[in-house]
Amino acid sequence: MTITPDRDVVSLEREFSDYAFEQMHPLVKVWRGDQLKTDIREATTRLVALIVDDAAGKYAETLKGLAQLPEQFKMRLIEIERYRFLAQIDFADPSASLPFVAIFGASTPPGTIADARVVRWLADKFAVFAPRRIRFYQSAHVPIEAAGTHVDQHFLAGLAREMAARPSAPGLARVILQRPTDLGFYRRYVETYNLMYLERPQIRGEVRIETEETLAACHAEGLLYEIEVDGTWAGIVAARHQVVAGARGTYMVEILLNGAARGQRLGPAVHQRLAAKVAAADSSAILTGTIAAVNVPSLKTATRAGRVEIGAWHWISV
């Protein structure tokens, strides 16, 4: 569909912001209050801009081997029967051999669309890439009705001040968070991950090592900490301020305990220490984060720490 840059873009921003607000988890509406609509509008504005800006050209340039025009990579407004979607082609691997359609906005929560033809028709709009899967986000309070879906990543959140005020987590007195002066720990961090991959090979590809650039950005925001257990280095926890799935919060980029500290149920204590620091800076802050479906230990830790599942990204095959 052709979009007229001024009038149509503003109309789409309003339309898809309304959809996102209607579909938002009730807890987020309570936590964010009047600010939520502003959060959603800012996020939606960035999405709609991808329909008309030149970012697709830059993306296409990095994937020259696919020999497709830049327009094929743009965010698209797609209408199928009574449904409207903002969707874009994406790839699950750097070689672009695993294409999928990413839904970023929808008039109806995609997981409630029981008619399998709709997702097939949506995939057909990107037929030049031959996608076999569609990925979408849906709030946890909305039941999944579409057949053949499974969770890719869980999205959990909690009000930081409430997490900090919970009864002391086991081992809390043993855990200290210290802000590092630099990223001198990075090599040790990577080594810790590589050892964990050996112990739990199923998480390789699902849980990634963060780049120095990403952790430096967390450090710049004052949200990077080294974890000490009993006075000894035991890992890191890092976060950033950002909007994810329409919810503005302090997003947990990383939480990693080394082999010596894992298995002692200290994860909730790390969460509680971080929540206290975040709440001290902003009493209205939400602590958010994604957890891969295969990372069951981290999911259990997050829920024990007081985070609740407010949504998830799902896969559906076509």
Question: Which residues make up each language-model segment?
Answer:
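Conserved acetyl-CoA-binding loop-helix of GNAT-fold acetyltransferases
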Residues: 114-124, 257, 263-280, 299-304
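Short amphipathic alpha-helix that is part of the acyltransferase structural core
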Residues: 1-57, 167-210
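Conserved beta-hairpin
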Residues: 29-35, 39-54, 58-88, 220-237
